[in-house]
A protein has these predicted regions:
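Signal peptide processing junction and immediate N-terminal pro/mature segment
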Residues: 24-32
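N-terminal secretory signal peptides and thylakoid transit peptides that target proteins
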Residues: 1-15
Length: 459
């Protein structure tokens, strides 16, 4: 029987590490222990720095353009999406298809950026993230805000509210709920009223956005780009970023440990610090990364029937470094739980993995309770965490989909690769394994306690 290439690589890599250590003479046992300690420290360093590096890779790819478009814009300029995410969307994993995004990567090192939030009668908020993927603020009230590096000293115009961010790199994500393609003109009208400019330009009375730059080498998928880095490239990048995006004060203990690997602001990484077989250990660590993240992040998951979701401290991670990396890898830019929760399932009611080879019914007994302007949706993703290509370009069902309801008000959604006779309540999936996200925006407390979550049953 021929062994699959992926399994062969896993076994071969592991075997090589075992042989390399067991062949050492007895008198070098202490050195072997040091090697194991170096491996553990390497993992710790990677888990600590990954969110910062993936954030920068996302910034690099998203700003790699001379002029603003619907999916890229130079630094300090809006990326106004003109349509919902689809199967071609690769900028972030698990994109939502409920809202139109307006994003911007900001550099607030020289001066604050003025951000104008317009008046609207629908769900609209602006998530402000620092370079470490923490949510510094959520802007919902109409008005003018100055997004400012925390150590900036200066005067702001009257009526402008200061928003402090501890890092120079900032990512803003505005989400505007959409009721369907026919609602796009209304959403674009809201986008047109949004404002973004440097403080000096605001004080001068206007601003002509400068041209950006384009480099073909920066046309990459951020997650793939970061996971393909070797140790030196990864930690060189992290060290450089920490110069202008300083670690939190609470990170001091871990940084003292990582100094042994020359990881930290002002450090110059030397892969010789990893000892013998450093390249092999790096590859082995990456192979085991997903399993380790899933295992160590279980303490932060919350159960909701057959669904699980990431609870606090999501969005404000503190020293939960492994959890922070897990979220950055699987759902970069996730909201805090007061804004939204994202229950996920990849199994049916019997615990069997969901696959496009079967047909399922998702039964929603009652809509999840939400606060004013809240809403819900169910979205299907493939094994790669991207939306699944399908013949009708439908990637989710939601409370705005015009779904057929049963006499008791419940909803039955068909999950399948092949279309049913009536496609009104059909959510297409691909041939392979898939998983579902149930997004609940502005959840009421009852959604987490008294509400009966949906059930996925195999037909």
């Amino acid at each position: 029987m021929k062994m699959p290439r992926r399994d062969f690589l896993n076994v071969s890599t592991a075997a090589a590490v075992v042989c390399a250590t067991t062949l050492l003479p007895v008198e070098k046992a202490a050195a072997a222990q040091q090697t194991l300690a170096a491996q553990n420290l390497l993992e710790q360093a990677y888990l600590y720095a990954f969110p910062l590096v993936i954030m920068d890779a996302t910034r690099t790819a998203s700003t790699n353009t001379r002029t603003a478009t619907s999916n890229k814009a130079p630094i300090n300029q809006f990326i106004h999406a003109e349509k919902l995410a689809d199967a071609t969307t690769r900028a972030v994993v698990t994109p939502n298809v409920d809202t139109i995004y307006t994003q911007a990567f900001l550099d607030v090192g020289a001066e604050p950026m003025i951000y104008g939030v317009p008046q609207t009668d629908r769900f609209f908020n602006v998530q402000v993230l620092d370079a470490w993927t923490n949510t510094a603020a959520v802007l919902e009230t109409p008005g003018l805000y100055a997004i400012t590096r925390a150590d900036w000293q200066g005067e702001l115009p009257e009526g402008v509210q200061r928003i402090d961010v501890p890092t120079t790199m900032v990512w803003t994500i505005a989400r505007i709920v959409l009721s369907g393609q026919e609602d796009l003109p209304n959403v674009r009208a809201i986008q047109d009223k949004m404002q973004l400019m440097p403080l000096s330009a605001y004080q001068a009375g206007g601003w002509t956005a400068p041209a950006g730059s384009y480099d073909p080498a920066n046309d990459f998928v951020p997650v793939k780009h970061v996971l393909a880095m070797d140790a030196k490239e990864f930690f060189d990048t992290a060290n450089q970023l920490m110069e202008t995006n300083p670690p939190a004060a609470a990170d001091a203990p871990v940084l003292r440990e990582l100094a042994a690997l020359h990881v930290g602001p002002g450090e110059k990484f030397d892969d010789k610090a990893l000892g013998l077989f450093s390249g092999l250990r790096w590859k082995l660590m990456l192979l085991q990364l997903k399993k380790k993240l899933l295992s160590e992040s279980k303490g932060y998951t919350r159960q909701m029937g057959q669904w699980t979701y990431f609870g606090d401290p999501i969005g404000n991670f503190g020293t939960a470094y492994t959890y922070r990396t897990m979220v950055a890898l699987r759902g970069l830019g996730a909201n805090t739980t007061d804004v939204a929760i994202y229950p996920k399932t990849d199994v049916d009611s019997t615990g069997t993995v969901l696959t496009g080879k079967k047909t399922y019914t998702l039964h929603i007994e009652a809509d999840p309770p939400t606060l004013e302007k809240g809403f819900w949706s169910v979205t299907a993703y493939g094994e790669n965490d991207f939306l699944i290509e399908n013949p009708i370009d439908r990637y989710c069902v939601n409370d705005r989909s015009g779904l057929h309801r049963n006499p008791d008000g419940s909803i039955d959604i068909t999950l399948s690769k092949e279309a049913p006779a009536d496609t009104t309540n059909w959510l297409p999936v691909g041939e392979g394994d898939f998983h579902l996200f149930l997004r609940i925006y502005k959840p009421d407390a009852a959604a987490l306690t008294d509400w009966q979550p949906p059930v996925v049953r195999t037909n």
